[in-house]
């Protein structure tokens, strides 16, 4: 019986190291490829756009004693970014069809700065277009405002020159 208890103890101790591992159990903060919708007032077309954003998990801590002030929490932030341009088709005369979009080059876990970041959680908002047309959901024909993945605009690498 002692042999069995010793074997069980060894087994628990050997697997306990995996639970206390420094390796992240969730994807770490890093640039992630996503498709966002780009639109502009005066341009009738909403265009899907391939870009990179910062996403992933950062380690955090919570105080056990509620009487102490909360600890500052880190979030996945942009570290380095570049700007690319997307040209929207069909814009009205006098409307600049070029929209500049940030693309994440590198990311880091840091305190959230409300001056340039949205520090809140995800909302129940669509990342699609405001001007999308609705169509009967039973139809097999896709809406005319949707673009097939083969027609997605790739960013034209355009440096943004400070003025």
UniProtKB/Swiss-Prot annotation:
Say yes or no: keyword Zinc-finger present: no
List where in the cell it is found: Secreted
Known glycosylation sites: 50, 124, 139, 145, 150
List every stretch annotated Disordered: 135-163
Principal place of residence: secreted
Entry keywords, A to Z: Disulfide bond, Glycoprotein, Hormone, Secreted, Signal
Q: What SUPFAM superfamilies does the record tag this protein with?
A: Cystine-knot cytokines
Q: Which GO terms describe its cellular component?
A: cytoplasm; extracellular space
Q: Which PROSITE patterns match?
A: GLYCO_HORMONE_BETA_1 (PS00261)
- The region annotated as signal peptide is 1-20
Q: Name one Pfam family in it.
A: Cys_knot
- Highest taxon listed in the record's lineage: Eukaryota
Q: Where is the composition biased (Polar residues)?
A: 135-151
UniProt KW Cell wall biogenesis/degradation keyword = no
Molecular functions per Gene Ontology: hormone activity
Q: Which GO terms describe its biological process?
A: G protein-coupled receptor signaling pathway
Q: InterPro entries, alphabetically?
A: Cystine-knot_cytokine (IPR029034), Glyco_hormone_CN (IPR006208), Gonadotropin_bsu (IPR001545), Gonadotropin_bsu_CS (IPR018245)
What is its quaternary makeup? Answer: Heterodimer of a common alpha chain and a unique beta chain which confers biological specificity to thyrotropin, lutropin, follitropin and gonadotropin.
Function, as annotated, reads: Stimulates the ovaries to synthesize the steroids that are essential for the maintenance of pregnancy.
Q: Which family does it belong to?
A: Belongs to the glycoprotein hormones subunit beta family.
PANTHER family noted in UniProt: GLYCOPROTEIN HORMONE BETA CHAIN, LUTROPIN SUBUNIT BETA
Any idea what this protein is called?
A: Choriogonadotropin subunit beta
Question: Lineage of the source organism?
Answer: Eukaryota, Metazoa, Chordata, Craniata, Vertebrata
């Amino acid at each position: 019986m002692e042999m069995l208890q010793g074997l069980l103890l060894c087994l628990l101790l050997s697997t306990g190291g995996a639970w206390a591992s420094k390796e992240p159990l969730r994807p770490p903060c890093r640039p992630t490829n996503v498709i966002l919708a780009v639109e502009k007032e005066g341009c009738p077309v909403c265009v899907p756009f391939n870009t990179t954003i910062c996403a992933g998990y950062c380690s955090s801590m919570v105080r056990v004693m509620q009487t102490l002030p909360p600890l500052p929490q880190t979030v996945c932030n942009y570290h380095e970014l570049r700007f690319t341009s997307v040209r929207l088709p069909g814009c009205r005369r006098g409307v600049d069809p070029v929209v500049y979009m940030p693309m994440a080059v590198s990311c880091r876990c840091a305190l959230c700065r409300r001056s340039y970041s949205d520090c809140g959680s995800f909302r129940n908002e669509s990342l699609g277009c405001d001007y999308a047309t609705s169509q009967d959901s039973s139809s097999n024909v896709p809406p005319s405002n949707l673009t097939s993945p083969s027609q997605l605009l790739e960013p034209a690498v355009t440096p943004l020159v400070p003025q």
